[in-house]
Amino acid sequence: MSGGKGKAGSSEKASTSRSAKAGLTFPVGRVHRLLRKGNYAQRIGSGAPVYLTSVLEYLAAEILELAGNAARDNKKSRIIPRHLQLAIRNDEELNKLLGDVTIAQGGVLPNIHQSLLPAKKAKAGAASQEL
């Protein structure tokens, strides 16, 4: 009888996750489950969660890279919401994508309107041209 787990049926190999097959870190299975539970469509194709997961992973990596650069510029080793805000608002495409998103504790971009800045003094070489 070969009903139990014996050495005779050990030709089975360990299962490989869809995330590993696609070379992703984010969970494809979880995204697939959330797509099914979310009632976005009656049927979900097998490639849709892989594609969506890869897009989400790319966006997360892009934002985290820019936020890490902002943290390093501020001589910090930990990313805080302010760094996320600076990273997103200084990048044209991410700002367009996340323009209506409010980041808690993010603050605002430093910006002083030109009319509020002190007037520049005239150069000495351009003396008065009075007659």
Curated annotation (Swiss-Prot):
It holds the Pfam family Histone. GO terms for biological process: DNA repair; heterochromatin formation. Phosphorylated to form H2AS128ph (gamma-H2A) in response to DNA double-strand breaks (DSBs) generated by exogenous genotoxic agents and by stalled replication forks. Phosphorylation is dependent on the DNA damage checkpoint kinases MEC1/ATR and TEL1/ATM, spreads on either side of a detected DSB site and may mark the surrounding chromatin for recruitment of proteins required for DNA damage signaling and repair. Gamma-H2A is removed from the DNA prior to the strand invasion-primer extension step of the repair process and subsequently dephosphorylated. The modification N6-acetyllysine is found at K5, K7. It is found in: Nucleus; Chromosome. InterPro entries: Histone-fold, Histone_H2A, Histone_H2A/H2B/H3, Histone_H2A_C, Histone_H2A_CS. The modification N5-methylglutamine is found at Q105. PROSITE patterns: HISTONE_H2A (PS00046). Residues 1-22 are annotated as: Disordered. GO terms for cellular component: nucleosome; nucleus. A motif ([ST]-Q motif) lies at residues 128-129. Keywords: Acetylation, Chromosome, DNA damage, DNA repair, DNA-binding, Methylation, Nucleosome core, Nucleus, Phosphoprotein. One of its GO terms (molecular function) is protein heterodimerization activity. The modification Phosphoserine is found at S128. Signal peptide: none annotated. The keyword Nucleus applies. SUPFAM superfamilies: Histone-fold. It comes from the Eukaryota. The modification N-acetylserine is found at S2. Belongs to the histone H2A family. The [ST]-Q motif constitutes a recognition sequence for kinases from the PI3/PI4-kinase family. The nucleosome is a histone octamer containing two molecules each of H2A, H2B, H3 and H4 assembled in one H3-H4 heterotetramer and two H2A-H2B heterodimers. The octamer wraps approximately 147 bp of DNA. In contrast to vertebrates and insects, its C-terminus is not monoubiquitinated. This is Histone H2A.2. It comes from Candida albicans (strain SC5314 / ATCC MYA-2876) (Yeast). The gene is HTA2.
